[in-house]
């Protein structure tokens, strides 16, 4: 069973992602801060991380950099999730090197296709 770490501080968004992923047979781990996301990624080495960008504490981009900077977690695919889709935000996400970008509200078909594609690619 593949494991997906969801790093999201919005309870409704967390529940939606968790419910959709679990219904498709994925195991989920949950973090509500960037620091907690980095810790869970390091301890559990999930198959994929879904990373909100606007988080309390360190933001999603900094959490992503810490995950990529650790030899034990650098190969884990990370998807940026954000409601902020301005050109400046998109270019910051692209420049950081995320494996994919999904806007909110989540398009369920695109969400599941992205998760499946990145886990299979891994």
Question: Where is each model-derived feature located?
Answer:
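Conserved acidic carboxylate
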Residues: 8
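Short hydrophobic/Thr-rich beta-strand motif most characteristic of the beta2 strand and flanking loop
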Residues: 25-32, 40
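C-terminal output helix
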Residues: 106-116
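Active-site residues of response regulator receiver
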Residues: 52, 82
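Short amphipathic alpha-helix used as the core "switch/output" element in two-component signaling
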Residues: 39, 61-74
